[in-house]
């Protein structure tokens, strides 16, 4: 027998799928309580048991679409080349933004800024990929700086490509943007002290938790010094 909680979850899932489909295909203006309720096979008042209004529904719909995207990224097994994995993740993210302009616009709208679970998970996946590069001695900046540079460049690239007039579209812009970021954050080869001290520092910070001779406090202090 289905419990009340299960029925509620099933109904909410129907609403979310209906709202997400309208958002993806027709944009925020199409996500009205009446249209969503019709698509979900419900009466409009039923939606207010789950959402306070249209803005709440829009945010939830955008989060639903992005959560599906992030979940698909988690199923991708890492390769032996962390830099190529980073490039593949970049391409996937750019493709998602271009294929879902309405969703991307809502997620990045400063007036609606929200730190959602899916966004946090997406940043974590990126941070893990950057961490693998640092562990390989290929990172010339801090992991935090690398993550922020990649995110900034990715958001800017998607926004630019979405707003360019068709006659000015540049199919190679995303690749060029990644290459520019890569030059800024990557060492050409695993670093040695005489080649790239910044990359050595980034790699050494990865090893700090594994140094048995240091206490947690000592490791934290050394990490603070290395960040400077």
How would you name each of these model-derived features?
Residues 14, 22, 26-56, 60:
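Helix-turn-helix
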Residues 18-22, 96:
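Short amphipathic alpha-helical elements of helix-turn-helix/winged-helix folds
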Residues 128-131, 166-228:
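C-terminal peripheral helix-coil segments that are non-catalytic and often amphipathic
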Residues 111-162, 170-183:
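Amphipathic alpha-helical packing segments from all-alpha helical-bundle domains
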Residues 32, 105-108, 142, 193:
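Short, hydrophobic secondary-structure boundary micro-motifs
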Residues 11-19, 36, 61-65, 69, ...:
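Generic hydrophobic, amphipathic alpha-helix propensity
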Residues 60, 71-103, 110-114, 121-123, ...:
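Hydrophobic alpha-helical connector segments
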